[in-house]
């Protein structure tokens, strides 16, 4: 994908991001799935959370497998100390564009009972492929029903997701001015 990948979201479902090489063509691996790990490569995952405190929370982990779901699971366990299960899937069109993507994140509450943990593990292990579930037409709600089978599930709120960029020419100009002419010229020379 390149040297950098940056994704930002908000609690309002607004997402924006960029990758160092947006035109990468991800081939299938030996299992016929997208070779995400091959495209992502080695590196680090940095997570910055603005929790309304004086400074944002910053967590960093080395990528373990470069499979996004697996590395998010690792991040939650090591950086935030929250046992989690993450499953992601992407349906691609023949022209290498994304038809549909989806997934889930399930996190245990502190002091979860062993029976709860065992049931969640059983449910997650039954899900062999989020991509296949998307192909079968599962909705976010029906995906959650599979993950949380045997639990009283209640959807309190639905937050639609959207690409959102709060960038503007004025904001970029202010950022460039704050860097200073000398540093900008040095950056151009490099």
Where are these regions (language model features)?
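Glycine-rich loop at the start of a catalytic domain that most often binds anionic cofactors/ligands
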Residues: 8-12
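Short, small-residue-biased leader/transition segments that mark boundaries at the very start
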Residues: 1-6
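A generic structural signal for well-ordered coil/turn residues at beta-strand boundaries
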Residues: 41, 57, 82-84, 100-102, ...
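Short, flexible, solvent-exposed loop/turn segments with mixed acidic/basic and small polar residues
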Residues: 48-51, 94-96, 152-156, 162
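Cys/His-clustered metal-coordination modules, chiefly Zn-binding fingers
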Residues: 125-190
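Active-site environment of non-heme Fe oxygenases that use a 2-His-1-carboxylate facial triad
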Residues: 76-78, 83-133, 145
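Hydrophobic alpha-helical segments and helix pairs
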Residues: 20-81
